[in-house]
A protein has these predicted regions:
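Chalcogenol-based redox active-site neighborhoods
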Residues: 1-165
Length: 165
């Protein structure tokens, strides 16, 4: 268990600074961090292309949408964090209409603050590995690398229901 560090500032999709630290210290939440690689997929090494969980951002987001009320009823907000440019992220949010809070971390603040794993395409574009954090009481209770994006929401909901975090 890790206390959420201070001074993690991300961006909202309307480009406003957002104090993620203050938010995460005062809200229980499930944070899914997705790579949304897009065209850069072809520029990944063969090993990365074969890594489980590299594809599936849309399925992951839509499944969180389907279970959002259940997360909320258990006292958890759902937050989606991506590192692509804000225009692309805004388009993704509009396409999935999930109703979750989307935040942008194109500066990789979470990588520095929490040492979250990242990777890069051959053109230098950097991405987070797909991962989900369960935050409760201002503490990061668990961090999971996600290799089955389509099952992530269901799996996290089960962990919360069973207090397995």
């Amino acid at each position: 268990m890790i206390k959420v560090p201070t001074s993690i500032y991300l961006r909202t999709l309307d480009c406003k600074e957002f104090d993620f630290s203050a938010f995460a210290r005062t809200h229980d939440c499930v944070v899914f961090i997705y790579p949304k690689i897009g065209e850069d997929f072809e520029l990944l090494s063969e090993q990365l292309q074969k890594t489980a969980g590299m594809k599936g951002c849309t399925k992951q987001a839509i499944n969180y949408k389907k279970l959002l009320k259940e997360f909320n009823d258990l006292g958890f907000m759902v937050v989606a964090i991506g590192s692509q440019d804000i225009a692309a992220q805004k388009k993704f949010e509009e396409e999935t209409t999930t109703g979750v809070m989307f935040l942008n971390d194109s500066e990789f603040m979470l990588e520095r603050a929490l040492e979250l794993p990242v990777f890069a395409a051959s053109n230098g574009h950097k991405f987070y590995f797909r991962q989900t954090l369960i935050i409760k009481g201002g503490n990061i209770r668990r961090a999971y690398i996600v290799d089955e994006p389509e099952n992530d929401a269901k799996n996290m909901l089960e962990k919360i229901k069973n207090e397995d975090y």
